[in-house]
């Protein structure tokens, strides 16, 4: 398998795996705009040269859009291999490339968000355990922070206090999200429209800076839905799934 690094120089012409469309599509344009601002912060986007979902995205943890204390580590935003790409060892290829790059850059190790049982849009815990990752922290909602240290003496990553007990003081449905995932550009407006049409209390909070993300009241900032203050899910929804959730 041939792999390509997406950079500022080739961002315009390369597809971004999870949203394969032209650059005018709102999902593609929002993701590419977010990526363009991250490259100078050290973000790496490595993908299959073939079209499809086969890529890894990672960034120095100090610049990660999640509320963690993991100075010196590399944070994996997303590792996604699916469809016809599964079962060929490509996840291992991508992870190994990340490990090699992180070692060369003097990082202490890797860290990533996981759940004890596989959840949508989170990495497979069985795969990570097989690769040597272990749990280093866990929030009340079951979202875990896993790590693979290159140095046994290195401090372990941990969640910031604001993320350990996900809760907000607001009634109704409240969604925190970023532009890291391209699907949000399409489906967040769908939820806003659906909620309005069905008189469902709903507010979407677009996290637009690293500082906002690192102080968010949830370990997952990419997509975190709350109801009456309590965390509900990180699974992105269309109108039908949302209405089913609220029993409408």
Which sequence ranges carry the predicted segments?
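Conserved beta-strand in the GNAT
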Residues: 51-63, 75, 80
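Conserved GNAT acetyl-CoA-binding A-motif
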Residues: 102-120
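Conserved catalytic-core motifs of GNAT/GCN5-like acyltransferases
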Residues: 113, 132-147, 232-235
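C-terminal "cap" of GNAT-fold acetyltransferases
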Residues: 141-165
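Non-catalytic, surface beta->alpha helical segment in thiol-disulfide oxidoreductase systems
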Residues: 228-248
